[in-house]
A protein has these predicted regions:
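Surface-exposed alpha-helical interface segments used for non-catalytic interactions
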Residues: 12-13, 41, 80, 84, ...
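Glycine-rich active-site/cofactor-binding loop and its immediate structural neighborhood
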Residues: 60-96
Length: 169
């Protein structure tokens, strides 16, 4: 920071990239779950140090985002990174945490008058819950009032299109 390096670049090109590399090492069986958890702790410490230096974009006009990890999944590294980016973008972020019951996503979109709903999962076994949430939004007449963003390792454009999400990461 003192040398002129942007905090966001440090997060994206340093911490996120490092976590991605750790993930690949885990896939290649060079890292164990304990190694990934240590890397995640280091990444969170780095984000905490850089977060106060992020330039906040105040163009979001007080928009609200609801974010959480879908029911049945407790992997929240990606969710926490997206949360930081949304906050940096000027959004009010309502973080539901991990292993969030499907109905809670819909209830929170309604009670918070959310502009964006972000759902995350790292597991293929919990992906279908995202589609259930989108259908529940339709049933309550909320789907056209909120942008739905889904993300996680198993998520593809095909899946996002299939369930009616607006975008994926």
């Amino acid at each position: 920071i003192d040398g002129g390096y942007e905090a966001l670049d440090g997060i994206m090109e340093g911490l996120v990239d490092g976590m991605g590399r750790a993930g690949k090492m885990y896939e290649e069986e060079e890292y164990f779950v304990s190694d990934i958890l240590l890397c995640a702790d280091a990444m969170y410490a780095g984000v905490d140090m850089l977060k106060p230096h992020l330039e906040q974009d105040l163009t979001a006009d007080e928009k609200t985002a609801v974010i959480g990890v879908i029911e049945g999944d407790t992997h929240d590294i990606g969710k926490n990174l997206v949360k930081t980016m949304l906050e940096t973008g000027g959004y009010k972020v309502v973080d539901l945490g991990k292993d969030v019951p499907l109905k809670q996503f819909v209830d929170s979109v309604e009670s918070e008058h959310a502009d964006v709903l972000c759902m995350s999962t790292l597991m293929t076994t919990t992906m279908d819950g995202m589609g259930t949430v989108v259908n529940m939004l339709k049933e309550r007449g909320l789907r056209d009032k909120v942008k739905v963003m889904i993300g996680g390792a198993p998520i593809t454009q095909i899946f996002a299109d299939k369930i009616g999400a607006d975008t994926f990461s």
